[in-house]
Amino acid sequence: MNTFGHFLRVTTWGESHGRAVGCVIDGFPAGLEVDEEFIQREMERRRPGKKYTTQRKEVDRVEILSGVFEGLTTATPISMVVWNVDADSSAYESLKTVFRPGHADYTYWAKFGVRDWRGGGRASARETAARVAAGAMAKLLLRRYDVKVMGYAKEIAGVSCEVDDAEKAFERAERSPLRMPDERAEKEAEQRLKEAMSEGDSVGGVVEVVAKNVPAGLGEPVFGKLDAYLAYAVMGIPAVKGVEIGAGFEAARKRGSENNDPIVLKDGRIRFATNNAGGILGGISNGEDIVLRAAIKPTPSISKKQRTVDYEKMEEAEISVKGRHDPCIVPRAVPVVEAMVALVLADCMLMQGLIPRSLL
């Protein structure tokens, strides 16, 4: 499956060390003014080559090939391409016949009998550049309806941040090399990350995304629940191993009286005094902030020696992965999780009839 969505459908294509990665967006409404500078800023947030990220230096300049005329969307498929300019496959030559632990090398081979050994091919996080490009278009659409999607690193290397105000946290995190909004936590996480790097190892963490001003009523009962759709979207991101919404697994440790969000009247509107539900009840948005967290595993490409198998010789082997890899993928995962949340919300608003096919 390379296509995602219902009314708003996104197909991504391309491999890590191929000529390019890209996406085609179908079902996008006509008449939206396309802010290409905004799209490029979103790409910059995910782009490699920064502190604590892989030193693969990709420009990640998006080219819009179709679906936009004189600065406006035309309701025809929007095709976007990002050219790969700094792929170096030489470090993978020695890995042609061995599987890297923690990667999809073995499972792709087991399923298809063939795999692109250059940087993970289609399974590489390089594919997420296309998701961020598509997500930027979704954010531009949501912005028209005052819906904001903001993310930050909630936890890295076991060090968690305290967050009271999502908008302030987002602003602070954007100035942080680790995208952490808490300076104290950032310093401690940075120290743990450096320790792991010195040992040829890597660390994981948690991304938190908050969507504000989401209207009540998004999502469908039973099998079309908004929280299920969000989890499906985010779990499809490479390195994501878990998703929770609102109180999440902490709800299992609460009593009903603690977990239930009291319903109140505020300025003549029905609201909720707390938000343990994370903005979703019965699979349908309730008008409060959507709060989602994604667990990101440690980067599996590490120089520390690991056991594996050489499948040509059919014998056990030892592997030390060389090349340019992120010691922690969490900071660059933030805009990717945001992108998938934005695509889901835009799709649901189209399904609900809150966004027309033409904005003109």
Curated annotation (Swiss-Prot):
Needed co-factor(s): FMNH2
Gene Ontology biological process terms from the UniProt entry: amino acid biosynthetic process; aromatic amino acid family biosynthetic process; chorismate biosynthetic process
InterPro entries, per database record: Chorismate_synth, Chorismate_synth_AroC_sf, Chorismate_synthase_CS
Pfam family, one: Chorismate_synt
Positions contributing to FMN binding: R122, A123, S124, G282, K297, P298, T299, P300, S301, R324
Cofactor-binding details, from the entry: Reduced FMN (FMNH(2)).
GO cellular component labels: cytosol
Pathway: Metabolic intermediate biosynthesis; chorismate biosynthesis; chorismate from D-erythrose 4-phosphate and phosphoenolpyruvate: step 7/7
PROSITE patterns per record: CHORISMATE_SYNTHASE_1 (PS00787), CHORISMATE_SYNTHASE_2 (PS00788), CHORISMATE_SYNTHASE_3 (PS00789)
Binding positions (NADP(+)): R46
Gene3D superfamilies with a match to the protein in the record: Chorismate synthase AroC
GO molecular function: chorismate synthase activity; FMN binding
Reaction equations catalysed: 5-O-(1-carboxyvinyl)-3-phosphoshikimate = chorismate + phosphate
Domain of life per record: Archaea
UniProt KW keywords: Amino-acid biosynthesis, Aromatic amino acid biosynthesis, FAD, Flavoprotein, FMN, Lyase, NADP
Uppermost EC category: lyase
Family stated for the protein in its record: Belongs to the chorismate synthase family.
Function summary: This reaction introduces a second double bond into the aromatic ring system.
PANTHER family hit by this protein: CHORISMATE SYNTHASE
Protein name: Chorismate synthase
